[in-house]
Amino acid sequence: MKMKAKWLPIAAAVTAALASQAAFAVDFHGYFRSGVGVSTDGSMQTGLSDNAKQKVGRLGNEADTYGEIQLGSEVFNKDGKTFYVDSMVAMTSNGSNDWESTESKFQCTSANGTALDGCENKEDATFALRQFNVQAKGLLGFAPEATLWAGKRYYQRHDVHISDFYYWNISGAGAGIEGIQAGPGKVSFAWVRNDRSGTNDGWTYNDEMNVNTLDLRYAGIPLWQDGSLEVGVDYAIANPSDAQKDSANAQYKNAKDGVMLTAELTQGILGGFNKTVLQYGTEGYSKTFAFWGDGSWYGAEAKDGADGFRIINHGVIPMGNSWEMGHQLVYGVGNDMWDTNDKWETMSVVARPMYKWDDFNKTIFEGGYFKDKNKSTNGTSEEDAGYKLTLAQAWSAGSSFWARPEIRVFASYLAQDKKEMKGNAFNNGTADDTWNFGVQAEAWW
């Protein structure tokens, strides 16, 4: 009897935990990609350009291990009012070893373990808290269908999947009201913090500048059959501290607020879709369009009067029973972003046709080309350009373009056409082309 009595508290705790689990069912979602690859000179080389996979496509052009784990649960539901708690952690690494952690280590050491001069103190893996927020419905009498939210979250992100290119994404810590029915569409408003730091766009200043983004969107506007429109405005408020205003750094003192306007037309085609996007921005948003940004960072240091625009067309369209095609066209411009800059242009073309042999077996080709041009105020200009060609054989859980999990074997050829700004991109700066071979898995759920 004593033994039975000893286990009673444990049994009660387990029972309570199971009951709690039943009462608050947990939603489990995630994403990952990982694999192995080599190039003609060591491990895979993907540095054709800055933002290379966004410019020439991601297939056979990703050398990392990346994952997201999302857990969420509706913790309250009564009288039409609900509260949902959402969370997500993410990790990234280069996949070079079995044990990859955040433990700091030196890349090279002497015999006694002392770091040698010029060696980098490095971590194998990086972990990040991507989402932690509360979403509540039914609380607003004037809009019971709307969601009141606060915390850190992915916020209405717009992207091109084949290049992993996010072009409208102010995700971060903030608050807002989402999905207010207004006529044929829905209105959303958010306030999100997007500080300018040295991790954005290679900016070299260590002292972060506070930037707050106000976002207003009107989505789901019906136009014609299978056609809809979404429009939005983002207002970035540069908020330097008193110390930054008094510093000798003019980029802090002279930081200006900026506006980004976005319009996205979506057209359904043959069971697929095509999107055309027009964006215009002032001040720091000029750098967003020149350097493949999405609105989640603001180039507050841009010269007073800078502006820019971007045109995007992308989609995935079925072509008969056996073929599907994904594509991307991008043209972006930034004007007068710094003292010697007159105009920066960037353009990209990516196409990914896919042939389905059966419900689980497909062959994929992806080709991409890009060009960057920097024109200076003295009339001179520099250009970088290059391309990628990838052939892959894939096995996936279904025949759709979007079917995942997927395992793919690939071969990629990357080459530079022009290298006036970057120089040789491969083989430690000695070559302008390379081959990559590898195997990759990708899944979302």
UniProtKB/Swiss-Prot annotation:
Reaction(s) the record says it catalyses: beta-maltose(in) = beta-maltose(out)
Induction of the gene: By maltose.
Record keywords, A-Z: Cell outer membrane, Ion transport, Membrane, Porin, Signal, Sugar transport, Transmembrane, Transmembrane beta strand, Transport
Primary localisation category: membrane
Site features described as Greasy slide, important in sugar transport, chain residue numbers: Y31, Y66, W99, F273, W402, W444
Any Pfam family matching the protein: LamB
Segment forming the signal sequence: 1-25
Site (Important in sugar transport): Y166
GO biological process: monoatomic ion transport
Gene Ontology CC, one term: pore complex
GO molecular function: maltodextrin transmembrane transporter activity; maltose transporting porin activity
Membrane topology (UniProt): Multi-pass membrane protein
InterPro entries per record: G_neg_Bact_CarbUptk_Porin, Maltoporin, Porin_LamB, Porin_LamB_sf
Subcellular compartments: Cell outer membrane
Family, similarity comment: Belongs to the porin LamB (TC 1.B.3) family.
Subunit field text: Homotrimer formed of three 18-stranded antiparallel beta-barrels, containing three independent channels.
HAMAP family per record: LamB (MF_01301)
Described purpose of this protein according to its UniProt entry: Involved in the transport of maltose and maltodextrins.
Protein name: Maltoporin 2
Lineage: Bacteria, Pseudomonadati, Pseudomonadota, Gammaproteobacteria, Aeromonadales
Gene name linked to the record: lamB2
